[in-house]
From Swiss-Prot:
InterPro entries: MECDP_synthase (IPR003526), MECDP_synthase_CS (IPR020555), MECDP_synthase_sf (IPR036571). GO terms for molecular function: 2-C-methyl-D-erythritol 2,4-cyclodiphosphate synthase activity; metal ion binding. This is 2-C-methyl-D-erythritol 2,4-cyclodiphosphate synthase. It holds the Pfam family YgbB. Its cofactor is a divalent metal cation. GO terms for biological process: isopentenyl diphosphate biosynthetic process, methylerythritol 4-phosphate pathway; terpenoid biosynthetic process. 4-CDP-2-C-methyl-D-erythritol 2-phosphate binds at residues 9-11, 35-36, 57-59, 62-66, 133-136, 140, 143. A divalent metal cation binds at residues 9, 11, 43.
Amino acid sequence: MIRIGHGFDVHAFGEARPLIIGGVEVPYHTGFIAHSDGDVALHALTDALLGALALGDIGKLFPDTDMQFKNIDSRILLREAFRRVQEKGYKIGNVDVTIIAQAPKMRPHIDAMRAVIAEDLQCSVEQVNVKATTTEKLGFTGRSEGITTEAVALLVKSC
């Protein structure tokens, strides 16, 4: 049996903190306004994993009203979601993440993001795709006010 999940996340820029995307620190003059580290890529991917198995969403499991998640590394959240996937008897078929940002440029960091995600999901880097695009300077992402990310996860029942 296979299951497919979709995830979405968005964060605005505005805090003096490191910019973390896909588990990688991306050099930029500002970070995200967020309760956790604000990693939009891992948040969308976490939601995709949870959605594939009807396990709710990131806000249900890790509410931003709970101080234990304040400034938490989003890799911890992703790994916990994946633990739940494994508990249900599934493994990764593949994941695909799309980062929508005018700035900063993602291309130099994509290979590192893929490696981090593959490590956390205990799969091959060939099962992880990360790509980036812009909105051609349209909307808040086009004005470099923040970043949007979408993710899809295909889960396969373990034998």
